[in-house]
């Protein structure tokens, strides 16, 4: 059983209450705890948001893993960390959209929200601004876009996941 197996199992697991979540596995690096597997878990709150896993979810997960794990492995369930991000995006569009800019804003919002869906993000995955811009540029009406409130990419630890909190979209006519 590999760490990838534990990660896949925890991310596909459904509790007795029907809850799902997302997880990642890590092996402790101390000689005395060489067979201790740390699972970092978050439970799905909605289709777009994760939350700290409930005790019942963790208990169900541990019980399900206990049947599948190697006998020498000791699995410990920990809470994953959610790093929320607020974004202010300015998108430049052609002047021909003057008066109807409001039709482009929801399209951009949908693209950004899909980018941050919990099914599209992984633990330890950084927020690369160029990738986010690339997603926005898939809209043919957008000439240019920038994230105004971030100067650089956001890098996180292996047990953290980035989640969108607030989104503000400004439209600039060019």
Residues covered by each model-derived region:
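Carbohydrate-recognition loop of C-type lectin domains
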Residues: 1-125, 132, 173-174
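Immediate N-terminus of the mature polypeptide
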Residues: 80, 86, 92, 118, ...
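C-terminal structured "cap/appendage" subdomains that terminate the fold
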Residues: 111-155
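A structural signal for short secondary-structure junctions
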Residues: 31-34, 137-140, 162
């Amino acid at each position: 059983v590999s760490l990838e197996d534990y990660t896949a199992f925890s991310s596909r697991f459904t509790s007795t209450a029907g809850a799902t979540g997302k997880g990642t596995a890590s092996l402790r690096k101390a000689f005395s705890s060489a067979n201790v597997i740390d699972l970092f878990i978050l439970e799905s709150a909605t289709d777009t948001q994760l939350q700290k896993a409930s005790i019942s979810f963790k208990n169900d997960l541990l019980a399900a893993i206990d049947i599948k794990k190697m006998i020498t492995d000791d699995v410990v369930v920990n809470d994953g960390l959610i790093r929320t991000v607020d974004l202010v995006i300015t998108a430049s569009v052609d002047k021909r959209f003057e008066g109807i800019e409001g039709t482009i804003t929801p399209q951009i919002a949908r693209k950004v929200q899909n980018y941050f869906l919990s099914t599209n993000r992984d633990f330890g995955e950084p927020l690369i601004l160029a990738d986010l811009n690339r997603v926005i540029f898939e809209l043919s009406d957008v000439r240019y876009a920038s994230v105004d409130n971030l100067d650089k990419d956001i890098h996180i630890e292996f047990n953290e996941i980035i989640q969108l909190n607030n989104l503000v979209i400004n439209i600039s006519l060019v």
